[in-house]
Amino acid sequence: MTYQQVLDFLFNALPMFQRVGGAAYKKDLHNTIALCRALGDPQKGFRSVHVAGTNGKGSTSHMLASVLMEAGCRTGLYTSPHLRDFRERIRINGQMVPEEKVIEFTMRNRELFREIEPSFFEMTVGLAFEYFREEQVDIAIIETGMGGRLDSTNIITPELSLITNIGWDHTAFLGNTLPEIAREKAGIIKAGVPVVISETQPETEEVFRKKAAEMQADIYFADQLYDISVRSFTADAPHADYLLQDPGKGLQVLQSPLTGQYQLQNIRGVYAALVQLRRLGWQISDEALERGIRKVKSNTGLRGRWEILQQHPLVIVDTGHNKNGISYILQQLATVPRRQLHMVIGMVNDKDVSGILEMLPKDALYYFTQASVPRALDAGTLAEQAAGFGLRGRVIPSVPAALEEALQQADASDLIFVGGSTFVAAEVL
């Protein structure tokens, strides 16, 4: 089989949440445990950091990996979903897993897949863990797919756990209140393994403290330990300078190409995690920290976080796709000088569409679109729902065509935003 034939088999034969939604969700870890047992329990063959949270876990995971790379560690990175290439999910020192490994793993385990019937995500976890063990990584950063307690990645015993924050997303599976969702995320807290929480939230702090106490795990709330601010920030700048105050070390200036205001919490959480890794014996210098934050994009291939595609007109794309993520984006869009705001927007059909639409600015020009995945909400349906919130514009089902139309309509001093869904963002990157 060719690489493309293997991908076709994996995408079509295994349930994939990113494509079909809840039909791919498994309510226990049985399949993952069975699959990894058949593979020789590769998760026991490398050390790791486990990252969960509603928003920011992707940026956090990439920053941690970048810093550890700069510290000289052979570093694995497992994230999801991918934007353009399936292999983005599995990297070592920034390099994607080779096509040959994906082909070999799939061909060798086809009968096992038929027997166990793993989801697409469970399969990718098995592939990543086997690859990290084979390549003898020093450490791997493992990002959860959804939740924590029942997430397929939750068969590892990491050096450290990190939870970014809690917001409303995947409520059909994780719960309808922040404490309920927090309990699911807190499921990654392991016995005796320290845990960092990037952002203190009144509704969830006690949930995390209780779980950590039950597991006899030390817990650290990053925003209760370290102050962080941005020295200078303009939304169309290629980088920002963050000022991080550690009471034990003084002021540190960290330059990052991740310029969203929401990165303040992520960088602080990353710093708190690195402090704990140092206490565990990992050699991570201040220079490695500075270089890792500054080179996160080039080191790890991270894309789609407040990414500027062009100037005049300014085009910005972001993968934020739930109420919390969209809220951060809107706050930042409001700081950008422009004549007119154009919004190229598409969503998936299992999100709180109304909750997001009611937040969007009514003075923007809209281009309602849909990504090329089965979960995508029909562009016409989205436009109809948006009209109920006073949002009006054109229906252009093709994402690239919608962006092209916005570019034709926009003046050089206008701002075009593309997003609403990870999959919409992926089609213009």
Walk through the language-model features, giving the residues of each.
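Short functional linear segments
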Residues: 1-53, 60-62, 66-71
